[in-house]
Amino acid sequence: MLLLLLAVTAAAAVGAGPGKAVQFLAVGDWGGVPEPPFVTPREAATAAAMGRAAAERGADFVLALGDNFYYDGVRDEWDPRFQETFERAFAAPELRALPWFVLAGNHDHHGNVSAQLAYSRHSERWRFPHYYYSLRLHVPGTNATARLLVLDTVLLCGATDDFGVGATPRGPPDAAAAEAQLSWLQRRLAAARHDRYVLVAGHYPVWSVAEHGPTQCLLRLLRPLLRRHRVTAYLCGHDHNLQFLHEDGVGYVVSGAGNFMEASQTHRAAVPPGAARFFYGAPESPGGFAHLRLDADHPTVRCRERY
């Protein structure tokens, strides 16, 4: 299937939260279940905790890191899953007031990702302009800016089964489209050299100690670019836990605990020595997400669960 992928650039209004900072919540793998009630207890608990964090800590937007609808995405833009798994599940007033910037995961690609793009016309808070896109953020009260580059790592690397130990992507469905996305990313990273912070987001991890481990395709294609352009952090989901890793000046945030929680650290030996700084995947956990804050002079990431 030939996919026509367009670069999209948008501006995000920030500064709603307390303090002179860009703040946002990052949650991945949050997509409920395909039968009633279409949400899991962990998704409900995570949604409630995100609402409290937005109210108490502040947030300007939510970054949804893929696997938005388990297990096979959505059929069309009128699919009731948009209401059952998203609109009604994340219904706290503090969340309803925030835009959600969305990317696709492998389970979304089992269904109709174009329908998720089209749903942006039906919901004021669902912002999914294209498969990959760029956001420029302004730190309020300062001259500092941040660039967020949102990717489709499934189109870069291929599909995979989310529930298989070490399952690896099978290669891009369209090599030319994958190359176009990579070229777009290279240009955007080069253009972001004057931004205080540069964040890149995708579904598959670059580094992970957990069940799926490092994504070899991204180690080959993405890691050199992140290091060369001194990217602040790469954010992802796919592994169902919370992690922070740091390698060669780049932070790696894994936030895939919105719907499931897994304790596996099968691939701890596969990451560079000393890179893994934080891991949380307690089976009894109610789920979790990350809260990121970009001040004028430093970034902060906090991993959170129900509190």
Language-model-derived ranges and their functions:
Residues C303-Y307:
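Short, solvent-exposed aromatic-acidic interface loops
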Residues D297-V301:
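Hydrophobic residues embedded in beta-strands of well-ordered beta-sheets
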Residues M1-A12:
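Cleavable N-terminal signal peptides of Sec/SRP-targeted secreted and luminal proteins
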Residues F24-A26, V62-A64, V102, V200, ...:
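Residue-level marker for buried hydrophobic side chains located in beta-strands
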Residues A10-P80, E179, R187, V209:
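N-terminal active-site segment of His-dependent metallophosphoesterases
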Residues E35-P37, Y70-Y197, H212-A233, D239-D295:
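Extended active-site neighborhood of metal-dependent phosphoesterases/phosphodiesterases
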